């Protein structure tokens, strides 16, 4: 018999585990000043990372408030509740379900936040392929008029879930994790269709791999 626990209980346990692990992990953040300068000027940003490296980002909520686009699936429901418990806002949708509504919700939150609310997207989620970016993050950045910021995480020691599609990385206790932000760059509205959009996706992938 397969036991399915309520999403609320699962999210409570996972949020508690997150806080416990984070107490033992040393975080180092690189190239963060450029983002802070944009936020201070009232300019929101959209941070783009790979799905397997998302663990450390909610820890940065003290400097800003994040709005993350999360899948509308049941697994996404659990993740959204975990993020909410950690102080991260969520817009529900994905590449296949309710994506446009989620984009609009995130854009509205970022515009109203004027630099105090910033977007966060795992660009190869929610189902992969691993390290292959989708175009949703580009649409979000262009519609919100927000610079796009590629970001990577490198941990000295981590447990890798090798059977997961993304090979998710969970930092081990007493490891050091580097959050590395790339240079913010603009996504022109003209890059939202056709070959220009495909080229913009490849550019984002190259920038992410270049951090890594």
What do these predicted regions represent?
Residues 134-192:
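A cross-family acyltransferase "interaction/gating" segment
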Residues 84-87, 109-110, 166-172:
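Short, hinge-like loop/turn segments at secondary-structure boundaries
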Residues 1-63, 88, 107, 203-212:
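Membrane-anchoring hydrophobic helices of lipid-metabolizing enzymes
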Residues 105-140, 144:
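Catalytic-site beta-strand/loop segments enriched in glycine and acidic/polar residues
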Residues 59-63, 85-86, 112-113, 141-147:
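Alpha-helix C-terminal capping segments
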Residues 44-98, 160-161:
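Catalytic core of membrane glycerolipid acyltransferases/transacylases, capturing the structured
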Residues 1-26, 78, 100, 143, ...:
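Alpha-helical membrane-targeting segments
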């Amino acid at each position: 018999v397969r036991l399915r626990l309520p999403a609320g209980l699962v999210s409570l346990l996972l949020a508690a585990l997150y806080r416990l692990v984070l107490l033992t992990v040393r975080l180092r953040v690189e190239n963060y000043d450029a983002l802070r300068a944009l936020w201070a000027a009232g300019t929101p940003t959209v941070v783009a990372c790979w799905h397997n490296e998302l663990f450390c980002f909610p820890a940065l909520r003290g400097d800003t408030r994040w709005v993350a686009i999360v899948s509308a699936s049941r697994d996404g429901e659990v993740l959204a509740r975990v993020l909410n418990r950690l102080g991260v806002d969520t817009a529900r949708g994905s590449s296949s379900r309710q994506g446009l509504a989620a984009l609009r919700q995130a854009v509205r939150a970022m515009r109203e936040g004027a630099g105090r609310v910033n977007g966060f997207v795992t660009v190869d989620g929610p189902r992969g392929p691993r390290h292959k970016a989708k175009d949703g993050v580009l649409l979000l950045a262009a519609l919100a008029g927000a610079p796009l910021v590629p970001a990577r995480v490198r941990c000295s020691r981590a447990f890798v879930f090798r059977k997961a599609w993304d090979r998710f990385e969970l930092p081990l206790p007493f490891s050091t994790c580097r959050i590395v932000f790339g240079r913010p760059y603009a996504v022109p509205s003209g890059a939202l269709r056709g070959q220009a959009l495909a080229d913009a996706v490849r550019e984002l992938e190259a920038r992410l791999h270049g951090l890594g």
